[in-house]
């Protein structure tokens, strides 16, 4: 839990240092959602399926709120901060795309383990247990990538004399920082949950208790499916956020691209 507290300290320090209360309700609401997401990272003493799913839902709602705000930006808004955020959302989107791919692999692994249990195939059970370690490494690798990215995403936004734009840039940057921090916690959380799941104990001895093992596998499958649904929401929101930022940078020229792209995802 120390890692989660360090993440929260980084981002809370950023959001709590805001110079004044935003007058725009949308910006103030974005700050509130950011703080709520950070509060989630400090909640449990141990990762659980429900907690991970709640975190993904929190992240998805925060990003959707951000997208709603970005869509209402004027095309003439300065691009002094949007270019940086555009690159940061690309990194986040790529990480969550890979996360979704690993979840798909994990689902297939669970299906394979269930089939092995039904047929009392100890060799396939052992293979499933070995393959689980690959998923562990993938989740840990994704967390490490975003952990390295976190200091950059949480660094200060360059000052501007335009007060309203400065508040908007600060809110969006704080959201990006919180999204990166929460993503690290989600990735490490599901890796921790997986490490204590039925897959970790899939050895030939479990074939002697197929009913109990199958129940644990089904529980893990439900957890993965719940997280997967939320991850799709997060992925779509990240893509929409990037396209909204492109609209800010490119103005009316990219508006048609945004409408076409969001209809396709």
Language model features: what each stretch is:
Residues 1-265:
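Long, contiguous alpha-helical bundle segments
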């Amino acid at each position: 839990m120390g890692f989660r507290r360090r993440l929260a300290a980084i981002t809370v320090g950023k959001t709590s240092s805001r110079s004044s209360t935003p007058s725009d309700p949308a910006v103030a609401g974005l700050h509130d959602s950011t703080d709520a997401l950070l509060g989630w990272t400090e909640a449990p003493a141990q990762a659980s399926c429900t907690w991970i799913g709640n975190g993904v839902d929190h992240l998805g709602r925060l990003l959707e709120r951000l997208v709603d705000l970005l869509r209402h930006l004027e095309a003439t808004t300065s691009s002094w901060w949007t270019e940086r955020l555009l690159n940061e959302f690309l990194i986040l989107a790529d990480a969550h795309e890979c996360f979704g791919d690993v979840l798909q692999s994990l689902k297939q692994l669970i299906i394979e383990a269930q089939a092995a249990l039904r047929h009392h195939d100890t060799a396939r059970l052992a293979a499933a247990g070995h393959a689980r370690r690959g998923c562990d490494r993938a989740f840990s690798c994704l967390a490490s990538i975003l952990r390295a990215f976190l200091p950059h995403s949480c660094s200060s936004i360059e000052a501007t004399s335009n007060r309203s734009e400065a508040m908007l840039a600060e809110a969006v940057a704080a959201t990006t920082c919180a999204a990166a921090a929460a993503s690290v916690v989600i990735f490490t959380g599901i890796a921790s949950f997986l490490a204590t799941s039925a897959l970790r104990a899939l050895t030939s001895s479990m074939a002697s208790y197929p009913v109990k093992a199958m129940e644990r596998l089904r529980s893990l499958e439900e957890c993965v499916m719940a997280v997967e649904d939320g991850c799709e929401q997060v992925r779509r929101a990240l893509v929409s956020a990037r396209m909204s930022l492109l609209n800010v940078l490119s103005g009316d020229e990219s508006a048609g691209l945004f409408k076409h792209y969001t209809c396709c995802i």
